[in-house]
């Protein structure tokens, strides 16, 4: 589980895997909605759990990709921190699925994104999905200002550049999201995981609405400039969709 995940607040002390049983109804409604929009839309389907992980238990993602690929209009998209994609590679997605892999420096994965796939495996999953014809993106998220964060993210970008396939590098898009961290999350983690890394830093963060801590604007602006420049140095033709 990830110590910063908002699902920790939903479930109190653990981001449990949520599995729905009315998936046929939900999928029918999704496909129906896709045909009623004025223009083609992209539907985010991965907000309640990591669908790659859930798929290992339920097979729901396989069914969703196949059905939306055949009947849906527009695209569906989901993020993941897991690399178990082999079951998806041969599916007829018809270009209607956007696969987004979340990436972070290996030390953050090991100590803060506990139990998720290592960086090398995540990159290999991106290469596999790209080769299988899926639209693919990298989600550099959340950016966390740990000690030596600039060096860590430079190393991450270098690793991505050296390990991604040429096909993936030519087709990916990139999203960047800075960490937000709620008051409730901080209290839960202090009680449930007293030995875990401390994510709240009063010097770097400030409260701003809805019970959340954000990085102070001056630090965030500096980091955005730094990351945009370093991403562009390595991935000059790649779209940075947003930095938030």
Predicted regions and their residues:
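Auxiliary Fe-S-binding modules of radical SAM enzymes
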Residues: 161-244
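Conserved radical SAM core fold
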Residues: 49-52, 83-86, 99-116, 142-147, ...
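Non-cysteine beta-strand/loop elements that form the S-adenosyl-L-methionine
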Residues: 86-106, 173-180, 198-203
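A beta-strand-loop signature enriched in Asp, Gly, Thr, and Trp
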Residues: 127, 131-180
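Short, electropositive alpha-helical surface patch
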Residues: 58, 99-102, 149-165, 194-201
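Structural preference for beta-strand elements that scaffold enzyme active sites
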Residues: 40-44, 75-77, 96-100, 135-139, ...
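Conserved Radical SAM active-site core
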Residues: 4-100
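Structured alpha-helical segments in the cores of large, soluble enzyme domains
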Residues: 29-36, 87-92, 119-132, 227
